[in-house]
């Protein structure tokens, strides 16, 4: 149980960090005020959930997991390339939607592989999936 709990929390922490990095990069590249406000709102939600998850990890004596360096570098480069093709709010929203979909798939997979994880960690992971689903829905108006 403890191993599944810790692994799930670490994935949630890393996922929140990756999402925050992407949102910062994309927010700088868009001048659409409504999209910028939506990104800021969800960045704040990710920061809040990350703090919750990180405190659960700390209570168990573990440090938060940083996103894998290669994955982080690839995501940043990929986002930069996609934005260079067409730097507008439509492209920015599409990139963020892709990120939401990836987060939903990744965290849902970890939830399914962690049936023995604590109820609190499963709750945090499910909250992250719901947040990504909501963000994805709200981004549709910008594509």
Regions found by a protein language model. Give the residues of each.
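Alpha-helical bundle segments that constitute or directly flank the non-heme di-iron/ferroxidase center
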Residues: 1-30, 91-115
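Alpha-helical scaffold segments that form or flank carboxylate-/histidine-based iron centers
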Residues: 4-12, 33-51, 89-96, 119-131
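A structural signal for well-ordered alpha-helices, especially hydrophobic packing surfaces
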Residues: 20, 50, 54-57, 78-81, ...
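Conserved alpha-helical segments that form or flank metal/cofactor-binding pockets of metalloenzymes
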Residues: 36-70, 139-143
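Short, highly charge-biased, low-complexity peptide segments
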Residues: 62-67, 116-123
């Amino acid at each position: 149980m403890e191993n599944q709990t810790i692994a799930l929390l670490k994935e949630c922490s890393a996922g929140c960090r990756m999402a925050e990095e992407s949102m910062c990069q994309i927010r700088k590249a868009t001048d659409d005020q409504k999209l910028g406000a939506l990104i800021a709102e969800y960045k704040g939600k990710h920061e809040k959930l990350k703090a919750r998850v990180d405190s659960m990890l700390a209570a168990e004596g573990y440090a938060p997991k940083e996103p894998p360096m290669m994955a982080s570098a690839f995501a940043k480069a990929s986002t930069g390339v996609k934005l260079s093709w067409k730097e507008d709010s439509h492209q920015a929203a599409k990139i963020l939607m892709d990120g939401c979909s990836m987060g939903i798939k990744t965290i849902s997979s970890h939830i399914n592989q962690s049936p023995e994880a604590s109820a609190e960690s499963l709750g945090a992971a499910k909250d992250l999936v719901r947040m990504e689903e909501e963000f994805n829905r709200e981004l549709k108006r910008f594509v």
